[in-house]
Amino acid sequence: MSRLVVLLLVLLIAVPLQAQDLVLHAGRLLAIPGETDATNQTVVVQNGRITSVMDGFVSASDAGLPDAKVVNLREHTVMPGFMDMHTHLTGERDPERNPHAWTTKMDGDVLLESLPYLERTLMAGFTTVRNTGANHEIILPLKRGVEAGHIVGPRIVAAAGGITPTGGHGELHGYREDILHAVNNSVGVCDGADDCRRAARALIKRGADWIKITATGGVLSNTAAGLGQQLMDDELVAIVEAAASMGRKVAAHAHQAEGINAALRAGVASIEHGSYADDESVQLFQETGAYLVPTLYAGVHLLEEMEVNDNIPPPILAKINEVIPNVKASFQRSLAGGVNIAFGTDCGVCPHGKNAREFELMVEYGMEPIAAIRSATVMTARLLDRTHDLGTIQAGKIADIVAVAGDPTADITVLKSVDFVMKDGMVYKAPE
């Protein structure tokens, strides 16, 4: 389907919502999770931004906005909108679905199928996501549709494809060569430092906000090529340098320690998964300031899928059994070592809209509840270089705000039931 037709479909989806002046009465406000915790607070929102935070429940008139709507969240814990740093919004694993169905679909079909995934993600309280791998002809129109207000969904920071070596985790596997040549989009496939520079520049030309690379093998690629380092050291450095020269940062999918450490030495901003992070990895994280995006939920979900899905290809099944038992220990090692941790789920592998399950696993594996909340707000804003706009509830910030009944610092599972969602000052979900 042509880009013009896809764009027309997007424009017909919905009428843009309009931001309005609002006065929020928060029973408890975690304005800067991990730093501030206050009760009986008023948050004033105008033109999509937070204009003030005041003690007490201030009336609309006393806030200087007599016509503003007052939102009663006096029985709720109010927090900044959550951010998920590892999503795949254009698909979702389903054991009941034909795994080859994508070969019959046009880009427009996939775009339309993605709309519920975006809406479910936003309604779960995730107002910003970093999409770490999708066809640029689909994810970029989705991003623009959200920005224009035509699509209900989270703010999208898009990788717009990925970089992988020939035969690497990011390539298609298990199909005839003539089929692969017909459907494979090879702009991100590179071999050698010069070719990998080209790949990074090509993705940026397409519109990538970030560069996603597969530094190691991966679990869900249908090939018995292992989980070790696949992009070589000089290729990693070339990608990071090329991306930096055009103002982009690099996120590296990496499982085995050698690939994690090589990517960190090359200067990537984040490691995705980090399943075998070792002591050297922790030291490199500390030295570089890079972030771990742990994606704990994806692994747990794959183990659950194994119980009901008898059709997982043997190479994938073997890697699931190899990797997942190591994830908890690796996360705990990174946590104990003071590694920067940014929230990320790998939703698409796991169900969209269930992102908050990651919070539960982070706490189950040893993270304090407030630190888990901070990982999805303050820390994610830092990773995205968006602390001027996102991550906290402060005057001048974009009004991305969520609320839950109950105390998430005592029971993290309440984050799985978000009652209130605001993005860009627009209310998408509110208590009955």
Describe each region flagged by the PLM.
Residues 29, 33-79:
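Histidine-rich, glycine-flanked metal-binding segment
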Residues 5-16:
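Bacterial N-terminal signal peptides
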Residues 76-150, 166-170, 234, 258, ...:
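Metal-associated gating/positioning segment near the N- to mid-region
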Residues 102, 245, 249, 314-315, ...:
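His/Asp/Glu-enriched, well-ordered alpha-helical/loop segment
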Residues 93-97, 139, 169, 221-223, ...:
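Histidine/acidic-residue-rich catalytic or RNA/ligand-binding cores of hydrolases
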Residues 113-139, 152-162, 208-221, 249, ...:
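Divalent metal-dependent hydrolysis catalytic cores, especially in the metallo-beta-lactamase
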Residues 141, 195-292, 322-341, 388:
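Histidine/acidic residue-rich metal-binding segments in metalloenzymes
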Residues 90-110, 166-185, 219-232, 288-324:
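Active-site gating loops and adjacent loop-to-helix segments of metal-dependent hydrolytic enzymes
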